[in-house]
């Protein structure tokens, strides 16, 4: 998938790469395959930015990060890497949440009964579980 398509709806402040084919998305260099977009996520014990050089050496096509690394490379700087990773992942999988319909049942009494009745009606109409 083209990087530009993956970045649809992602707010970024700096981008040093344009047309690149991305073959996957990864945030762990131990699982990175050549052609992947590497997301450098800040963490509690370690910071994914420490692994940018390793990711590029392993063949990452681009890096999604919160601050530009010192080394030159194909990166996209975003204000929140976790939010950007969520948006990029949604784009990668074709935004499946956009095709979902959610129902909610609220109230004090009768929620369980109502949900069982709704389930039975929807299964009868849609023919699926």
Each language-model region and where it sits:
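Phosphate-binding loop of NTP-binding sites
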Residues: 7-10, 85-129
């Amino acid at each position: 998938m083209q990087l530009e398509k993956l970045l649809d709806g992602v707010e970024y402040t700096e981008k040093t790469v344009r047309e690149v084919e991305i073959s996957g998305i990864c945030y762990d260099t131990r699982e990175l395959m050549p052609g992947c977009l590497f997301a450098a996520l800040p963490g509690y014990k370690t910071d994914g930015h420490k692994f940018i050089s390793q990711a590029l050496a392993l063949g990452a096509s681009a890096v999604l990060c919160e601050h530009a690394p010192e080394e030159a490379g194909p990166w996209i700087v975003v204000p929140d890497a976790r939010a950007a990773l969520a948006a990029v992942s949604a784009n990668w999988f074709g935004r499946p949440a956009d095709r979902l319909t959610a129902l909610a049942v609220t109230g004090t009494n009768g929620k369980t009964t109502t949900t069982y009745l709704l389930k039975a009606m929807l299964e009868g109409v849609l023919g699926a579980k």
